[in-house]
Amino acid sequence: MTEESEETVLYIEHRYVCSECNQLYGSLEEVLMHQNSHVPQQHFELVGVADPGVTVAAEAASGTGLYQTLVQESQYQCLECGQLLMSPSQLLEHQELHLKMMAPQEAVPAEPPPKAPALSSSTIHYECVDCKALFASQELWLNHRQTHLRATPTKPPTPVVLGSPVVVGSPVGQTRVAVEHSYRKAEEGGEGAAVPSAAATTTEVVTEVELLLYKCSECSQLFQLPADFLEHQATHFPAPAPESEEPVLQQETLTPAPVEVPVSQPEPVPSSDHSYELRNGEALGRDRRGRRARRNNSGEPGGAATQELFCSACDQLFLSPHQLQQHLRSHREGVFKCPLCSRVFPSPSSLDQHLGDHSSESHFLCVDCGLAFGTEALLLAHRRAHTPNPLHSCPCGKTFVNLTKFLYHRRTHGVGGVPLPTTPVPPEEPVLGFPEPAPAETGEPEAPEPPVAEESSAEPAAPGTYRCLLCSREFGKALQLTRHQRFVHRLERRHKCSICGKMFKKKSHVRNHLRTHTGERPFPCPDCSKPFNSPANLARHRLTHTGERPYRCGDCGKAFTQSSTLRQHRLVHAQHFPYRCQECGVRFHRPYRLLMHRYHHTGEYPYKCRECPRSFLLRRLLEVHQLVAHAGRQPHRCSSCGAAFPSSLRLREHRCAAAAAQAPRRFECGTCGKKVGSAARLQAHEAAHAAAGPGEVLAKEPPAPRAPRAARTPITSPTTLGSAAPAAPAAPARRRGLECSECKKLFSTETSLQVHRRIHTGERPYPCPDCGKAFRQSTHLKDHRRLHTGERPFACEVCGKAFAISMRLAEHRRIHTGERPYSCPDCGKSYRSFSNLWKHRKTHQQQHQAAVRQQLAEAEAAVGLAVMETAVEALPLVEAIEIYPLAEAEGVQISG
């Protein structure tokens, strides 16, 4: 009985607030230590110190001895009884005696009073502030105080609300602490009377008192436990709303767990910021262990009913099933509600993140629900939630909200995205020694997982190996194959997240997913200290430091750090471009690239600077702009590709494709992020942004393919010449599967084919604003405009001669180097430029055409001569039949 009372007292722990700065503390010792910083060094009045044979008045009048020592050192006074103590630890032990007395218990004979800290031979007494009577123990003093409370009843103080504490004054006046104290005499307690002296109170029976913290605002009735108070409040409010006006003390006393954590993880202790805290973790542990012991005690009558009223998540006790159900909803749905919409969240951080959707920083607004998003891509992904069928369904039964993840999943089924048929397996067949995973934390028993039989799927491909029939993967052990089939090819997802309802195959996946709700990132990178929420994400991140790219394409040899990126890359070789731009016809294999491309048509980029009217396609470019233009600092640039980053950490995380391909493109556009190979090209590209409008200049320009420099070298001769390409630096072999419908020429990208088709259609969408001449590509227009401006940005390092086009500079450099990379396959003559080779090839073409015409003329003349010479002779029948139509066509009459 005593242990239960002590545990109950620990559960309804006090909260202490500093009266000077309103700072909250979980224990009296902490607040007293804190208040020493506010209290100047002063002497306090000793309430009562008596020595055998010496009165208190005489000791005080003498001004010497023990009294002066206590006056100088004692700075800690109990607010309940006024006793002065020497240290915070003694005051804490003294306060626990008050708490033990406040617990409801049967009247028992008084035990000898606990010994106060002995100071020489003196004894500390307790003085009544009303009648100045002295008592030898706290129990007798509290019993005497009840007589004054019954004689002059006073209204109990209002429960403390955080932010506006009620300060309880003390005789000292310097260590005032806001504590919730409301007492009343127990109705079944013994009757005690005031004792004028310590000698007369040695046989006094201790009267029990109880701590009443909760007052009903309707009927002013007092309650000790929050469960009793809530049960009573239900009588006044039969149908409370989900956000009912519950007192703040309920939230301060209850300890809900915002997130359902796994059993293997330690249970978090609520922090003081959420207004429900206990004194320390040990008190919480003792409280929970005591409740579990009482709940598991089957010997008590009604133990089964009591066990049903305990919350399995936080061990909270409730008096009715309705209260328990209402409490369980807080674990499932959350307890923090958005004031602007009806959504609830499990933690304040989730609510703060959600409130950012309502802020004015978002530019794209959903017309159905009012939520705003920072980019158009997020808005389009959110808009699908308002459609009749918001989920992407796969034929295998899985559903996805995100389109990208749905496309990733479909590729696991192979060509067509249709899952292969699986062999049905009896559910009763045992698994090969593999233990069943623990059931999900829903409290309901789940059906056993259908195991996979070895006879139906484990076909030995080689001695000692087992092959999976679904993906042809081989394993060295049957147990490994069984585990692979259970967790890779299993269609159902048994483990559910208690916060958002998302399903997972493994319980470990649920634990990793829960960290996205709690914000926990327990796996830091040893190189840059960046934290991650799972070991897999950490391992993927560490590849950026080591430079390792374990996933390599078998067609072009390009390597990647993730298998999903490799799967996306293979779509390029498969010529799978399902996303088409409606304005210019350019196709993309990823949806976000189409969204990025659409900004070039509209001319409005999503990330706008607050200090100037400029906008940017990427957030990184906006941060770099603010760093350079408004902060006057230099960004961190990649030495391989020239990309700029606002911090060195972002630069270290940068995965440079140019460095891997050894083809640096060192100049990046600060507006759209496009990289070019020279400063002149960058200036021309930025001039296009600054032209009449980005929509007019860049709208019809498809994004240039980011191929290596060697692949862009013009070495392919026209098909009309019908000859091989001249000798040039060899480029990596690439598949060319896009064919022109007019000339049957093949191209590797949709962009190259789109530009080539303008040759047949005659389309020239880029006119010069100075002379009106039109061009098929925007780069040709940029080169042409330099003729009007006289700009020659490309200068030779040897002779200083400048050119308007970089290609002319490259041809000029060959004069100094003597290089002639373009040779004629007919005569072997070589040239410095492809245009000179083209002109030279035309001479061979003209000679070839002249020779063909001469041969045709000679053949025609020979046929006519043969007819004229043999017309008078008798010819065989077969020759006559062959010559007759020819002679008739020439107008020659053949006599018979």
Curated annotation (Swiss-Prot):
Chain intervals with Low complexity compositional bias: 259-272, 707-732
Chief site of localization: nucleus
Molecular function terms from GO: DNA binding; zinc ion binding
Keywords, sorted A to Z: DNA-binding, Metal-binding, Methylation, Nucleus, Phosphoprotein, Repeat, Transcription, Transcription regulation, Zinc, Zinc-finger
InterPro entries: Znf_C2H2_sf, Znf_C2H2_type
Location of Asymmetric dimethylarginine modifications: R832
GO cellular component terms attached to this protein's record: nucleus
Zn finger (C2H2-type) start-end: 16-38, 76-98, 126-148, 214-236, 309-331, 336-358, 364-386, 392-413, 466-489, 495-517, 523-545, 551-573, 579-601, 607-630, 636-659, 667-689, 738-760, 766-788, 794-816, 822-844
Family per record: Belongs to the krueppel C2H2-type zinc-finger protein family.
Annotated function: May be involved in transcriptional regulation.
Protein known as: Zinc finger protein 574
